[in-house]
């Protein structure tokens, strides 16, 4: 029976193996997810400025993918770009709607 008992050297080697060390699993600090403004870019897709709001949606998705890849600074930068492009798209869309309504109602008046 003594031949099946683990020796002290075996226990020491097992305790120092990387698979047995679970304390190092939490060495990465948890970085909070930066805002990617996905909801804003989806809302901007309803405005009639189609090439611009599609670019905002792409920036937002790229921000999410950058965060998942571990590029936190790139995710923050792309999220900020998505926000400003979506705001520009909404403003341009509202201008297009306003101008088309003004032209329509002044012609038929």
UniProtKB/Swiss-Prot annotation:
Q: Which residues lie within the membrane without crossing it?
A: 42-62
Which residue stretches are annotated as topological domain Extracellular?
106-109
Q: What does this protein do?
A: Probable accessory protein of voltage-gated sodium channels.
Family that this chain belongs to: Belongs to the CD225/Dispanin family.
What compartments host this protein? Cell membrane
Membrane topology note: Single-pass membrane protein
* Acidic residues bias (residue ranges): 21-30
Q: Which residues lie on this side of the membrane: Cytoplasmic?
A: 1-41, 63-84
Disulfide bridge positions per record? none
Quaternary structure note: Interacts with the giant stinging tree toxin ExTxA (AC P0DQP3). Interacts with Nav1.7/SCN9A. Interacts with Nav1.1/SCN1A, Nav1.2/SCN2A, Nav1.3/SCN3A, Nav1.4/SCN4A, Nav1.5/SCN5A, and Nav1.6/SCN8A.
Residue ranges annotated as coiled coil are none
Q: What is this protein called?
A: Transmembrane protein 233
- GO CC annotations on file: membrane; plasma membrane
Region: Disordered; residue ranges are 1-30
Keywords, ordered alphabetically: Cell membrane, Membrane, Transmembrane, Transmembrane helix
> Membrane-spanning residues where?
85-105
Organism, by scientific name, is: Homo sapiens (Human)
């Amino acid at each position: 029976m003594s031949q099946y008992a683990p020796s002290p050297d075996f226990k020491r080697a097992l305790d120092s193996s990387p698979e047995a060390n679970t304390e190092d699993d939490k060495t990465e600090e948890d970085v909070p997810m930066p805002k990617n403004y996905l909801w804003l870019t989806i809302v901007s897709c309803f405005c009639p400025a189609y090439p611009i709001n599609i670019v905002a949606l792409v920036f937002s998705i790229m921000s999410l993918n950058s965060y998942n890849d571990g590029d936190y600074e790139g995710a923050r930068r792309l999220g900020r770009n998505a926000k400003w492009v979506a705001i520009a798209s909404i403003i341009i869309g509202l201008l297009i709607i306003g101008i088309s309504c003004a032209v329509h109602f002044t012609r038929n008046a």
